[in-house]
Swiss-Prot record:
UniProt cross-references to InterPro entries, sorted A to Z: SAM-dependent_MTases_sf (IPR029063), tRNA_(Gua-N-7)_MeTrfase_Trmb (IPR003358), tRNA_methyltr_TrmB_bact (IPR055361)
Annotated protein name in UniProt: tRNA (guanine-N(7)-)-methyltransferase
Residues engaged in binding S-adenosyl-L-methionine: 44, 69, 96, 118
Annotated organism of origin: Streptococcus suis (strain 05ZYH33)
Enzyme class, first EC level, given as a word: transferase
Molecular functions per Gene Ontology: tRNA (guanine(46)-N7)-methyltransferase activity
Positions bound to substrate: 122, 154, 191-194
Residues at the active site: 118
Catalysed reaction, written as an equation: guanosine(46) in tRNA + S-adenosyl-L-methionine = N(7)-methylguanosine(46) in tRNA + S-adenosyl-L-homocysteine
Enzyme Commission number, as recorded: 2.1.1.33
Length: 212
């Protein structure tokens, strides 16, 4: 979902290089050095306003997190959260999810999150869905052997499509939630959309899929 442009967003991102990486191509293969440790690295593709990735970073200080979003304004709101939290284990990137191999070396990322991605419901837009085969090819390259994707959505159609896409790719569906909030998940960190939709009584779907 597009948001109204935010005045000063570009300057805000540029003025906080400790969190916002402006030259991600130069970081490929060097993320442990950038974080200053060898802790696992988890990324969220389509991090929106940053509630999930910031919450995860606060909850798991021994894991490094990278929030990725192509929209400058949205990323600037994520930066607001990061600055308020003051956490050392989080970075932000303004890049496209289809180009991740330009910024991460093979197996450099330990886990990947997709939360409430655009469902692109029209058939002609299938290739834009973040669980389409070409995206899975990209994710597999930067994740380790048996690396995992954790996926959440309120959209039943996208969820069913994604389950089929993961399965057709040869991934193992380790765990599937057809009603996340009814079934419960210890340590679940909600996104902005997740709270909004669940408050309206909408079901939240989740799956943990593992490459083979």
């Amino acid at each position: 979902m597009r948001v109204r442009n935010r005045k000063g967003a570009s300057e805000l991102l540029a003025n906080n290089p400790q969190y916002v990486i402006s030259n991600p191509e130069e970081c490929k293969g060097k993320w442990a050095e950038i974080f200053g440790n060898n802790n696992p690295i988890h990324i969220e593709v389509g991090s929106g306003k940053g509630r999930f990735v910031t919450g995860m970073a606060a909850q798991n200080p021994d894991i490094n997190y990278i929030g990725i979003d192509i929209q400058m304004t949205v990323l600037s709101y994520a930066l607001d959260r990061v600055l308020e939290a003051g956490l050392p284990n989080i970075k932000l990137l303004q890049v496209d999810g289809s180009s991740l191999t330009n910024y991460f070396a093979p197996a450099e990322i330990d886990q990947l999150y997709l939360n409430f991605s655009d469902p692109w419901p029209k058939k002609r837009h299938e290739k834009r869905r973040l669980t389409y085969k070409s995206f899975l090819d990209t994710y597999k390259e930067i994740l380790p052997e048996k690396g995992e994707i954790h996926f959440k959505t309120d959209n039943r159609g996208l969820f069913e499509y994604s389950l089929a896409s993961f399965s057709q790719y040869g991934m193992v569906l380790k765990q599937v939630w057809l009603d996340l909030h009814a079934d419960g998940l210890e340590g679940n960190v909600m996104t902005e959309y997740e709270e909004k939709f669940s408050n309206k009584g909408q079901v939240i779907y989740r799956v943990e899929a593992q490459f083979q």
